[in-house]
């Protein structure tokens, strides 16, 4: 048996088991419509499901809001207060010093582009950007475009260097990364969790390498800046931005219960103050600061909020954080959702550690069960403690896209393709993989149903659509319906 498919030992300790018994997943699932749709929702790395409360809030806000920073009416001022409070909540939840560290964007991709355009004029001929082969396209393509398409037009040659990862373990090759960073490395880009391999690079070690580069930044610092892609890390872990020590951290709320259209760039305030904004126009300029011969920027964070923002999306996104606290904290805690209660960082740590523990247990179960599927190759670390809550794999003789389609026919949500992680797939010599991914509303029964369906498809052929009951050794829950129809419309 290859290392890619060898069985693993469960990581559940007695303490973890007691914690899981206290985790009220059935109560949590009662907040979501998908549980009534007869589907196994295991494509959460792409997007999570929105709970009732956020959908209701969004509908309510649509009927009563006005624009922000653009009116003296009671409705406008009320909406402005809620909108600005959302920035405070986001900063508090992530351990950022203040709202001045927060840039609200559409998604993680836009966050990376915002960094790229903000720093673009600072690059000098002969500089380089160091990234890794673990990156999502959103943290590779902008830098490729900068180095190969944009800066050469201005006579500046900037190299893009990529650090390898170990193909067996999926771990980032820190020695190779260190060899690429030098005194001309302006920026180091690294994911906090791969959306394909699940790998969680040691950001503290990456930060130390960036800090030691001796690159002369325009603000007088001698180090490389560090951009961390947190799209797959922030939704399932306790985040302390100040402790992380990164200059930039990105993520999207659609992977964290909120509807689509809101992402966040958390950034070093000094860099936001000294860098140029990504977009220009209304509200990002100061009152009375626009003249024919000069323009003055607004104070942070509004310097990076040009034009009418996604007001409703931003308010709902911040409330998603509050709702996560209510769902993840133990019963009896005062509620955060729809309240003015100041977010307590201790509560954030307790809640997100519980989320991480539960996701880890589901991932360990999936890894262990996948080891028994004939011909299956699992990619990335075998230890659930060293990876995010997803599993990507291939099965000999089966096209991954056809596997995902067959899983869909069996009522299981999956994703196949390169997951926008083309570099990592090419490094392993494959074009695509099939992926299952979990969030804190999933259950051990969900894992069993997904992998039982996969095993049936592999054994019977890719057109199989019947999901057998989970074996008693892996689940004590009732078996699912024999056939779960493919999603046909709204889940509401």
Question: Where is each model-derived feature located?
Answer:
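Pyridoxal 5′-phosphate
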Residues: 2-476, 480-492
């Amino acid at each position: 048996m290859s290392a890619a498919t060898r069985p693993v030992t469960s990581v559940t300790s007695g303490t973890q088991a007691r914690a899981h018994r206290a985790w009220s997943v059935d109560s949590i699932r009662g907040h979501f419509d998908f549980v009534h749709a007869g589907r196994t929702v295991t494509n959460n790395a792409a997007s999570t499901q929105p709970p009732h409360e956020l959908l209701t809030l969004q509908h309510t806000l649509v009927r009563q809001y006005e624009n922000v920073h653009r009116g003296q009416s009671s409705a406008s001022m009320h909406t402005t207060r809620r909108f600005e409070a959302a920035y405070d909540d986001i900063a508090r939840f992530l351990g950022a010093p203040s709202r001045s560290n927060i840039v609200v964007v559409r998604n993680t991709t836009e966050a990376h582009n915002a960094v790229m355009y903000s720093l673009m004029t600072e690059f000098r001929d002969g500089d380089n950007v160091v990234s890794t082969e673990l990156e999502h396209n959103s943290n590779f393509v902008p830098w490729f475009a900068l180095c190969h398409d944009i800066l050469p037009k201005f006579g500046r040659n900037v190299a893009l260097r990529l650090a390898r990862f170990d193909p067996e373990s999926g771990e980032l090759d820190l020695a190779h990364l260190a060899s690429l960073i030098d005194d001309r490395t302006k920026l180091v880009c690294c994911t906090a969790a791969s959306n394909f391999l699940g790998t969680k690079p040691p950001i503290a070690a990456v930060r130390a390498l960036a800090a030691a580069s001796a690159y002369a930044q325009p603000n007088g610092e001698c180090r490389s800046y560090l951009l961390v892609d947190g799209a797959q890390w922030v939704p399932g872990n306790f985040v302390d931005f100040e402790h992380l020590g990164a200059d930039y951290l990105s993520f999207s709320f659609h992977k964290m219960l909120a509807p689509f259209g809101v992402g966040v760039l958390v950034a070093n305030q000094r860099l936001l103050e000294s860098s140029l904004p990504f977009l220009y126009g209304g509200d990002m300029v100061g009152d009375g600061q626009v003249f024919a011969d000069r323009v003055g920027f607004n104070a942070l964070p509004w310097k990076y909020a040009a034009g009418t923002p996604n007001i409703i999306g931003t308010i709902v996104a911040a409330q998603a954080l509050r709702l996560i606290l209510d769902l993840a904290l133990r019963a009896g805690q005062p509620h955060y959702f729809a309240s003015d209660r100041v977010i307590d960082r201790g509560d954030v740590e307790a809640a997100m550690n519980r989320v991480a523990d539960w996701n880890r247990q589901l991932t360990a179960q999936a890894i262990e069960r996948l080891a028994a599927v004939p011909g299956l190759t699992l990619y990335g670390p075998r230890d659930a403690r060293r990876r995010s809550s997803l599993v990507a794999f291939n099965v000999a003789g089966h096209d991954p896209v056809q596997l995902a389609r067959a899983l869909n026919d069996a009522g299981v949500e999956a994703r196949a393709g390169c997951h926008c992680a083309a570099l990592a797939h090419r490094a392993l010599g494959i074009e695509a993989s099939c992926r299952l991914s979990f969030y804190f509303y999933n259950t051990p029964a969900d894992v069993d149903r997904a992998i039982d369906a996969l095993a049936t498809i592999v054994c019977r052929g890719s057109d199989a659509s019947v999901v057998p009951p989970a074996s008693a050794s892996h689940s004590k829950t009732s078996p699912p319906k024999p056939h779960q129809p493919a999603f046909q419309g709204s889940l509401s």
